[in-house]
Each structure stands twice: as C-alpha cells, then as structure tokens.
Design a protein with these regions (language model features):
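Active-site environment of non-heme Fe oxygenases that use a 2-His-1-carboxylate facial triad
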Residues: 1-77, 82-88, 92-97, 104, ...
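A short alpha->loop->secondary-structure connector
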Residues: 107-118
C-alpha cells in the first residue's frame, strides 16, 4: 500500500489521552509511588530466607514467598504503565542493607510480579547490568555498557516482540550526570498526525533495524519493523533512529528520502524540551516504563570509581513481555 493510501487509514487525531502528556501537563506526583513499610518488612524476611537457603536468582518465584504488600505495590506500578502515565518510579528500597546478589533477587522478584521476565541477549540473560564497562562503542557494544549519553529510544525495537515494560533498579547512582529523560510517543504521534500526516504514514511502513549482533551467526544482521502500529485501538511504537540508520546500512538498502524526513521530524518533536521530563534516578529507586508507548534517554555520566574497580553507576535492567516466549525474540523455542 502506498504512503498516500496509508494516510487515509491513520488512527484518530488524538489517541490515548492519559498517556499523551508533555512536560507542562505532568508532575512527579503522578509517577512516584512510595514503598510501604510492610513491603520493606517482606523484603527483609525474603533476604533472611535466602541467606539461610541460597538459590539461583532466576529460579525464584514470587509465589514461593510471603510478598503480598510488594505484590500490591507492583500491581499499582502496572496500572500506571498500562492506563495512566506510562511511567512509574518506586521510591525507594533499602538496597544498602543487602548484598548485590540479594538486590538482584529483589529486582528479579519485583519484575516477575509484573509478568514474564524475558531475555535481553541472545544468550538468554534476563538480568542485565547497565554500567560503564570501559568498552568502546561499536558493533555489538550497546551504549548501555558505556558512560555515554543515549538519544531517545525504546528498548528491543529490532525484536520480533519488543518488551512491553522496561525496568531499571538503581543499585548505585553516578557521581555526576546520568540523568533520565522520558517522552510520550503518543504525544509525538498526535503532533505528527496534526502537522504532517504524510510523514506519519511513512512511519507506519517498515524500516530496517540493526539487530545489534544479538542473533545466530547465520541470521540476517537487520530486521524489518515500522515505527508505529495501531491495532485494536492501541498504539504501539518502536523507536531508535540510530538503529534504523545502521539497519539500512547493514541490509544494504538505502533509507528513502521520505523515511529520512519522517525520522527527522519525529526526532524534532521528542527532543523538544517541552516534550520530556528529566530527573535523576536515585539509589534504591525502581523505575519502570511502558516501552511500547514511551521513549527514554540518559545524559552522559561520570563515576567516582573506574569501571575496572567495579564501582560507579549500576542499574539492574529488566524486561517484561506479556506475549510470546521468554527468549530474546519472543518466538517459540524450536
């Protein structure tokens, strides 16, 4: 179907109003959720249990422990992600009381209360450490393991099934920088619908995506997905301009002029300071985002310790996906 034909079938001009916020229409009281004393007490009991009977983190299931208050907390998080702001920051867990592996267990169990925790790498790793490893940015080395800033993006946009939700559990904050930014792709979609429906229509057709080397050796290095999809009255988005530009290079296909113009127009909207909120994620906070309707970025940061010493900014990242398998792409295992 041609782009001009697609324009006739775009969604309504204004969609998903609770999620179509801007900097001036949202405040921190809408995304902050306090941790109850009851939940902290449950976590203290959980850690005591694991010290008596250590088990592999990924073998742990919420139902095996008494975590009713924490489960109620994560139900509140999910409600914000699905029907409200699309962003939730839980403030905060006493991570300083626990060892790193115990905090990993806490992060895993909290994420599991939201639903299926899925792989973030082709090797099946479901717990992903976001920290500066000292590696230079290059093919197969994501910005998440450097101290570089990141442009606005959604996670896993190259996958067959991108994660529904992305969580960051802050085990240590940076000495300087590392600020988190969030923007509504629903708002951006609405703006393009009003201003340039022809460019929005192009974003509903496929682009090549860099798969980041996270695939079998004999698989293609790029996949194909649109930026926007609209089905059953629900908008879904995948966004990472760098991965699209690199994807076309890897696929050996030229990025068309209309596609390039559409990406530039979308970037101008999400990069506009009026479109995003910014704050520092503090030690002990758990940040969750609706990854299919919101994009996030971070500023560059500086750590007190070098990566080689094992210190510095450390986030435990978790992906949740409601459908498909737990494997990276979400396809059934073969």
């Amino acid at each position: 179907m041609r782009v001009d034909q697609l324009t006739e079938h775009l969604p309504p001009e204004e969609i998903e109003r609770p999620k179509a916020w801007t900097r001036d229409t949202i405040s921190s009281d809408r995304w902050l959720i306090p941790v109850s004393e009851a939940c902290v007490a449950e976590l203290d009991q959980l850690v005591a249990s694991l010290r008596r009977d250590p088990r592999p983190v990924e073998s742990l299931a919420p139902a095996a422990f008494s975590l009713r208050a924490c489960s109620d907390l994560m139900s509140e998080v999910r409600a914000k992600l699905e029907t409200d702001t699309g962003l939730a920051v839980v403030d905060r867990f006493p991570v300083e009381r626990y060892e790193t592996e115990e905090n990993r267990a806490i992060g895993w169990l909290l994420a599991a209360m939201l639903g299926q925790v899925v792989a973030q790498k082709a090797n099946g790793a479901r717990l992903y450490d976001v920290k500066d490893t000292g590696q230079a940015l290059g093919y197969g080395v994501r910005r998440s393991v450097t101290n570089l800033g990141q442009p606005f993006h959604t996670d896993g946009g190259w996958l067959w099934k991108a994660p529904n939700f992305v969580g960051l559990f802050c085990l240590e904050s940076a000495l300087e920088g590392g600020l988190s930014r969030f923007t509504s792709l629903v708002t951006a979609h609405n703006a393009l619908r009003r201003r340039r429906p022809d460019l929005l229509a192009r974003l509903y057709t496929p682009f090549a995506w860099d798969r980041q080397g996270e695939h079998a050796p004999d698989d293609g290095r790029a996949s194909e997905h649109p930026v926007f999809e609209y089905e059953g009255g629900v908008l879904a988005a995948r966004y990472y301009e760098d991965y699209i530009v690199n994807g076309h290079r890897l696929a050996g296909t030229a990025l068309d002029d209309l596609g390039r113009e559409a990406l530039v127009a979308l970037r101008a909207i999400v990069d506009d300071e009026a479109s995003w909120v910014e704050f520092r994620i503090e030690k002990g906070q758990l940040q969750y985002l609706n990854n299919r309707q919101f994009a996030h970025s971070r500023t560059a940061f500086k750590d007190a310790d070098t990566p080689q010493k094992g210190g510095g900014r450390h986030m435990l990242r978790l992906w949740n996906r409601d459908e498909g398998s737990w494997h990276l792409e979400g396809r059934p295992a073969t």
